[in-house]
């Protein structure tokens, strides 16, 4: 049983954070497009970013900032223009954005982190940004998480947020998060942005290690369309405002905090996968019996990302052969005679041998997921066992519908 509880408040649930989201005129649609998260005090900051060789200016900016100083006060995110593949002027725009915000907040630009999402090749509309920043700061509140979550989305159908609370020592500790993502989701850390706030006191090296592992078990284990974005960013702040003793070494308290951080990241990652463009259900793949966790995750992600598997699930076709084929090409050695495949409660293959099953009932299971409650009864569970090893891993994806092609045929990436 999880040693925490879900609470309301998103990224402003932890102590000492404010957030805002406004319409600044960056999006042609006139929808909210500028978000800000501010910690009342300097916070430990860590990040995980895209592995793409084509990176947005904000990604290079954040990497340089975090290499020089593992702390921050604010995260500024614009939606509408990715500011990727925009050359030296794009970098100058990013730097000016940080300087403008720092001046208005009366803090050093070194304490500002940036994120962008939108159309690749388009620079930020700087006039709109310049005019929007004072309004954005004036909108900051300690209940502004929903507004910020709404201002970072593009093709998303829903906003994504979560907050959890646990006890460390005798004091409550909270972690909150918001995210965006619907298409270009195949992170190797799609566009995928996630921002996490925490009020625990933790050393910078431990916080970065926790975040990297949490990312591997969440955002790096989801896929919608196999495309990795130029802008993928996961940024996490920890400001110590819970007043708990500082966590500086590995132990029970650090493990508890990391487990809750991972749970926050997994919730957001699953919400992104479920909101895949044109998707009707979430796919969760659980792999057991592998040599190690990395091997299990690799198999799981290959299955979750298979266009044939995704298409079969959209067609409500319990075609386990596609699952077997995807597992086999994952690049992880295993003995075919050990392979077991289960779809929901239906055991389809055992010890490498096909089993009789009620195809109509299995198809009905897939149909039910398309109409089930959000992130509850809308999940298709695929369980795969490849041997007797101790490695287990999960990955998440979504089905592949006609609407995915329609959405992306009409959207300028």
From Swiss-Prot:
It is found in: Cytoplasm. Disulfide bonds: none annotated. The record marks 117-118 as: Involved in the stabilization of negative charge on the oxyanion by the formation of the oxyanion hole. Keywords: Acyltransferase, Amino-acid biosynthesis, Arginine biosynthesis, Autocatalytic cleavage, Cytoplasm, Multifunctional enzyme, Transferase. Substrate binds at residues 154, 180, 191, 277, 408, 413. CDD domains: OAT. GO terms for biological process: L-arginine biosynthetic process; ornithine biosynthetic process. Pathway: Amino-acid biosynthesis; L-arginine biosynthesis; L-ornithine and N-acetyl-L-glutamate from L-glutamate and N(2)-acetyl-L-ornithine (cyclic): step 1/1; Amino-acid biosynthesis; L-arginine biosynthesis; N(2)-acetyl-L-ornithine from L-glutamate: step 1/4. Catalyzes two activities which are involved in the cyclic version of arginine biosynthesis: the synthesis of N-acetylglutamate from glutamate and acetyl-CoA as the acetyl donor, and of ornithine by transacetylation between N(2)-acetylornithine and glutamate. This is Arginine biosynthesis bifunctional protein ArgJ 1. The lineage of its organism: Bacteria, Bacillati, Cyanobacteriota, Cyanophyceae, Nostocales.
């Amino acid at each position: 049983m999880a040693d925490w509880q879900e609470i309301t408040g998103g990224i402003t649930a932890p102590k000492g954070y404010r957030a805002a989201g406004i319409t600044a005129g960056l999006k042609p649609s006139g929808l909210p497009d500028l978000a800000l998260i501010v910690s009342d005090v300097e916070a430990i900051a860590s990040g995980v970013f895209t592995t793409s060789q084509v990176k947005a200016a904000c990604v290079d900016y954040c990497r340089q900032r975090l290499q020089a100083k593992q702390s921050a006060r604010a995260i500024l995110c614009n939606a509408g223009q990715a500011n990727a593949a925009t050359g030296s002027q794009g970098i100058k725009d990013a730097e000016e954005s940080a300087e403008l915000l720092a001046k208005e907040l009366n803090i050093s630009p070194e304490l500002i982190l940036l994120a962008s999402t939108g159309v690749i090749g388009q620079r930020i509309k700087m006039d709109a940004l310049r005019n929007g920043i004072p309004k954005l700061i004036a909108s900051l509140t300690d209940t502004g998480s929903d507004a910020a979550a709404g201002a970072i989305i593009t093709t998303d159908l829903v906003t994504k947020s979560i907050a959890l609370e646990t006890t460390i020592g005798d004091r409550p500790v909270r972690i909150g998060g918001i995210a965006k993502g619907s298409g270009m989701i195949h992170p190797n850390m799609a566009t995928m942005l996630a921002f996490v706030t925490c009020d625990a006191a933790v050393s910078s090296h431990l916080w970065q290690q926790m975040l990297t592992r949490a990312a591997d078990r969440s955002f790096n284990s989801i896929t919608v369309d196999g495309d990795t974005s130029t802008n993928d960013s996961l940024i996490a702040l920890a400001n110590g405002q819970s007043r708990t003793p500082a966590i500086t070494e590995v132990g029970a308290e650090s493990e508890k905090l990391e487990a809750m951080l991972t749970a926050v990241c997994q919730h957001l990652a699953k919400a992104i996968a479920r909101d895949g463009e044109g998707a009707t259900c979430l796919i969760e793949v659980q792999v057991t019996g592998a040599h190690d966790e990395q091997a299990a995750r690799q198999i799981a992600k290959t299955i979750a990302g298979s266009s044939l598997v995704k298409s079969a699930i959209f067609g409500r076709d319990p075609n386990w052969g596609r699952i077997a084929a995807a597992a086999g090409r994952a690049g992880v050695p295993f003995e075919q005679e050990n392979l077991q495949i289960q779809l929901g409660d239906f055991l389809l293959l055992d010890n490498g041998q096909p089993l009789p099953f009620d195809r109509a009932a299995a198809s009905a299971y897939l149909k039910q997921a398309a109409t089930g409650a959000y992130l509850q009864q809308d999940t298709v569970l695929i369980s795969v066992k490849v041997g007797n090893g101790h490695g287990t891993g999960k990955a998440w994806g979504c089905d592949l519908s006609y609407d995915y092609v329609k959405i992306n045929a009409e959207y300028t990436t």
